[in-house]
């Protein structure tokens, strides 16, 4: 009984820390494009983010129940993910929690893992940002050419951008949060506390990764909205195909797509190369650590 209680308390501490880091890193998914376009103040964006995350946590129980049935090696996977996410956040690089967790679990269960399925997932991780680039390029090119006054009203587009930011933040609370906490609890109170830790991470360190996204290319309110929309559409396409993909990678693809419409030189390739480098390295680190632990046991 004491062993179980200690294990749950340890999972709780690690989970809250991971959510804190998740907030610091993935807040950029929700408000990074709005921040880059100066749609409103960063303080207002953080308030919008926090409200949306906490509301999302109220709808997290179903996902938490599903994750709760798949809790094998959960504590070890959480520790590995916390380490890798901390490193990525320190490097100011947006990283997907799902890619890190999946790779850590592959490493921990290397002997029994279905590598064919992992290959399909890996392919979806590569293709999703590319699809987002294509969608964003097409949509923004079309937007620049159309002459419909209502679609050119910045105030209206700003509202759309803020709504899309709220939706992404809601999904962090309703989906990513229970991915972390659902391995050992489905308590609504714990989910709300977890949401507070997530918001705290965003408030204290979220500007680091958001600034990185804002450096990829210059964004207006309209291009920021199309980048966010394109990333969302790319994720929706792969979700419909049953493939887990990274919202982080898709949104970066969307930003790149709108940047390319203005010319290759408008994209800061050094920033983008650093992001892609860590997209490759971070999951590999998680996989290797998991594999080493697998061999030691």
From Swiss-Prot:
InterPro entries membership: Phos_transporter
Membrane topology summary: Multi-pass membrane protein
MF terms (GO), sorted A to Z: phosphate transmembrane transporter activity
An annotated GO cellular component: plasma membrane
PANTHER family: PHOSPHATE TRANSPORTER (PTHR11101:SF80)
Physiological role: Potential transporter for phosphate.
Name of the protein in its database record: Putative phosphate permease MJ0630
């Amino acid at each position: 009984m004491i062993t179980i209680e200690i294990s749950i308390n340890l999972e709780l501490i690690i989970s809250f820390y991971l959510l804190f880091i998740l907030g610091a890193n993935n807040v950029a998914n929700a408000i990074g494009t709005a921040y880059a376009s100066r749609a409103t103040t960063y303080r207002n964006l953080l308030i919008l983010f926090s409200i949306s995350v906490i509301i999302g946590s109220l709808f997290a129980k179903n996902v938490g129940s599903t994750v709760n049935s798949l809790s094998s090696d959960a504590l070890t996977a959480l520790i590995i993910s916390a380490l890798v996410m901390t490193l990525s956040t320190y490097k100011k690089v947006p990283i997907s929690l799902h890619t890190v967790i999946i790779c850590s679990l592959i490493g921990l269960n290397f002997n029994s893992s279905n590598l064919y399925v992992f290959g399909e997932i890996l392919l979806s991780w590569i293709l999703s940002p590319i699809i987002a680039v294509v969608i964003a390029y097409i949509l923004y090119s079309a937007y620049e050419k159309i002459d419909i006054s209502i679609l050119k009203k910045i105030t209206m587009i700003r509202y759309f951008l803020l709504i899309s930011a709220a939706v992404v933040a809601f999904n962090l609370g309703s989906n990513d949060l229970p991915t972390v906490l659902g391995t050992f609890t489905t308590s609504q109170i714990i989910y709300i506390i977890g949401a507070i830790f997530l918001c705290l991470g965003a408030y204290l360190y979220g500007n680091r990764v958001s600034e990185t996204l804002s450096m990829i290319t210059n964004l207006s309110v309209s291009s920021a909205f199309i980048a966010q929309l394109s990333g969302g559409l790319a994720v929706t396409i792969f979700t419909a195909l049953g493939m887990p993909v990274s919202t982080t990678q898709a949104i970066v693809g969307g930003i790149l797509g709108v940047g390319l419409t203005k010319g290759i030189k408008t994209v800061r390739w050094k920033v983008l190369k650093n992001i892609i480098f860590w997209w490759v390295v971070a999951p590999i680190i998680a996989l290797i650590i998991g594999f080493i632990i697998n061999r030691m046991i």
